[in-house]
UniProtKB/Swiss-Prot annotation:
Gene: rplB
Family stated for the protein in its record: Belongs to the universal ribosomal protein uL2 family.
PROSITE patterns: RIBOSOMAL_L2
InterPro entries named in the record: NA-bd_OB-fold, Rib_uL2_dom2, Ribosomal_uL2, Ribosomal_uL2_bac/org-type, Ribosomal_uL2_C, Ribosomal_uL2_CS, Ribosomal_uL2_dom3, Ribosomal_uL2_RNA-bd_dom
GO MF, any single term: structural constituent of ribosome
Name the UniProt record assigns to this protein: Large ribosomal subunit protein uL2
Gene Ontology, cellular component aspect: large ribosomal subunit
Keywords: Ribonucleoprotein, Ribosomal protein, RNA-binding, rRNA-binding
Region feature Disordered, mapped onto this chain: 221-274
């Protein structure tokens, strides 16, 4: 993995910082594991914008990544590592002994030729997936399920990991990167190790056009708008003279947005109380 700073041959190249991984496959992805991916432009089925700052960008195919890791007792070998335009992490194409191929998230340290396995009998080794009742306390894991059999939901982005800090009865306690402590059923699966490509955070796009290639549209400040468009808009000068709010008048910068009281009992400690 190399960090490359581009030379200032033009204004658009001056600030670009690239993350180059020579181990990534340079050819086409595995076609049977691709699906069409349509652009939403941030609109819902009514055509109304539900997520701002989304639109345009390069076409992509969706890679069918195996988040469940439920092919138990069959060893697999890593054929190659690949770039995935739909996520910050890299993915690995694995070939099982019965001939099936699947994509998985590529953990840190995994390389072509390595062997991996899933199931209760899998060894405690990076890349192996097994229920958390079989993983030692103190281990670092990623792609963690919140419900048994649902597939991994926690710690899937580049460099992400979770630590198992306790096991009590039918639950394990996890420490998330945010500092939050959370309980999850012991039969939920997790993959050992942390997600690779942690250097993703060091990249610098360098110009607005690079964000547009990724489907990210400009973010306009409310104070730069007119009063008809935003509560911060209008007035003389830059001060908007009130507590910051969203375009719809809801308080921002610190307001709690979580509303799922049913699962509050599984949160042992909030992230704000590190």
């Amino acid at each position: 993995m190399a960090i490359v700073k581009c030379k200032p041959t033009s204004p658009g190249r001056r600030h670009v910082v690239k993350v180059v991984n020579p181990e990534l496959h340079k050819g086409k992805p595995h076609a049977p594991l691709l699906e069409k991916l349509s652009k939403s432009g941030g609109r819902n089925n009514n055509g109304r914008i539900t997520t701002r700052h989304i639109g345009g960008g390069h076409k992509q195919h969706y890679r069918l990544v195996d988040f469940k890791r439920n092919k138990d007792g069959v060893a697999a070998v890593v054929e190659r590592l690949e770039y995935d335009p739909n996520r910050s992490a890299n993915i690995a194409l694995v070939l099982y002994k019965d001939g099936e191929r699947r994509y998985i998230l590529a953990p840190k340290g995994l390389k072509a030729g390595d062997q991996i396995q899933s199931g209760v009998d899998a060894a405690i080794k990076v890349g192996n997936a097994l229920p958390m009742r079989n993983i030692p306390v103190g281990s670092t894991v990623h792609n963690v399920e919140m419900k048994p059999g649902k597939g991994g939901q926690i710690a899937r982005s580049a460099g992400a990991y979770v630590q198992i800090v306790a096991r009590d009865g039918s639950y394990v306690t996890l420490r998330l990167r945010s500092g939050e402590m959370r309980k999850v059923p012991v039969d939920c699966r997790a993959t050992l190790g942390e997600v690779g490509n942690a250097e993703h955070m060091l990249r610098v796009l360098g110009k607005a056009g690079a964000a547009r290639w990724r489907g990210i549209r400009p973010t306009v400040r409310g104070t730069a708008m007119n009063p008809v468009d935003h509560p911060h808009g209008g007035g003389e000068g830059k001060n908007f003279g009130k507590h910051p709010v969203t375009p719809w008048g809801v308080q921002t910068k610190g307001k709690k947005t979580r509303s799922n009281k049913r699962t509050d009992k599984f949160i042992v400690r909030r992230r704000s109380k590190k």
